[in-house]
Amino acid sequence: MSTQTEQPMVSVEAICESPLGADLSESQCLLLAEASSIIGLDVGAPLLDEGHVDDRLYVVSSGSLEVFKPTGGGDTITLQLLHSGDMAGILGFVDGVPHSAAIRALTQCELIVLDRKDLEKLIEKDPQLVYQVMRTVVRAAHRILGKMNAQFVEMSNYISHQHGRY
C-alpha cells in the first residue's frame, strides 16, 4: 500500500540546499523552514491528482516522481520525471488553478511543502524573502514552458516534415 507521511519541521539545511534557498540568507532560510513542512512518499503513492486544487508548492528533496495523464482505457502517458530540486504544483501555488496532471512517486521520496498562506504570512516580516521565493517559482515555471515550447516545435516539425529533420 502506498502512503504519504508528513513531518512538521524542515531543516534549515534542506531549505538552503533547495532551489528555494538559492537567493536567501541563512536567517531567511530559517524563516522559510519554519513556514514549511516535509512529506515522505512511498513508491506508487500519489502526490497530486489531476483536477484537484491545492495551494501548496512541492520541492523534491530526494527521490523521483512521475508527472502523467490518463490516455484512456486505463493507460497513462508520462509527461515529465521529477528529481531532486524540481518543483511541482507551481500553478496551483501561484494561482489556485486545478492541477492539469497527476503525480506519483516512482521511488521513496521526500518533498519540502510550502503552503501559499504560510508564505503570505511572511510578506510583512520579510518581503525580500517572499520576493526571492516567487522569483524562484517563476524561474521554474519558465523552464517548464521552455521545454514545452521545444517539444511543440519538435512535434510540429515531425508532423509537417519541415527543415529536413525527419
Please annotate each region the language model reported.
Residues 1-166:
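Cytosolic regulatory regions built on CNB/CRP/Popeye-like sensor folds
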